[in-house]
Amino acid sequence: MTTRYLLDKSAAYRAHLPAVRHRLEPLMERGLLARCGITDLEFGVSARSREDHRTLGTYRRDALEYVNTPDTVWVRAWEIQEALTDKGFHRSVKIPDLIIAAVAEHHGIPVMHYDQDFERIAAITRQPVEWVVAPGTA
């Protein structure tokens, strides 16, 4: 079985770096990278103009499979956040990352990331997450 990943912006934004590009390009070529609603919004923030926003949207729609965000994801994100309070991490983990992790967990796919938040979440959920490259190298 081939693993498909939910691509977080923390990994995608580093695609200009050779090691990250080397990791992501084969996955993209094989259609193994996915997006969800919240990742689309995160990418939209980086647009410098309306035209750039449209270009980013078209690129993401063409390049990445879309996985939906069912209503149960919001409940699960709340549960994860609540569990993070026990470790004192509920304020340090970004809300979009909670949602992305819950979407990935719902669909049974790992998050491809470059963000410690997903490691903190996975310590609670035991879901698979993967650094796009080793931490500290990008």
Curated annotation (Swiss-Prot):
GO terms for molecular function: magnesium ion binding; RNA endonuclease activity. Disulfide bonds: none annotated. GO terms for biological process: negative regulation of growth. SUPFAM superfamilies: PIN domain-like. Coiled coil: none annotated. Residues 6-128 form the PINc domain. Its EC number is 3.1.-.-. HAMAP family: VapC_Nob1 (MF_00265). This is Ribonuclease VapC21. The gene is vapC21.
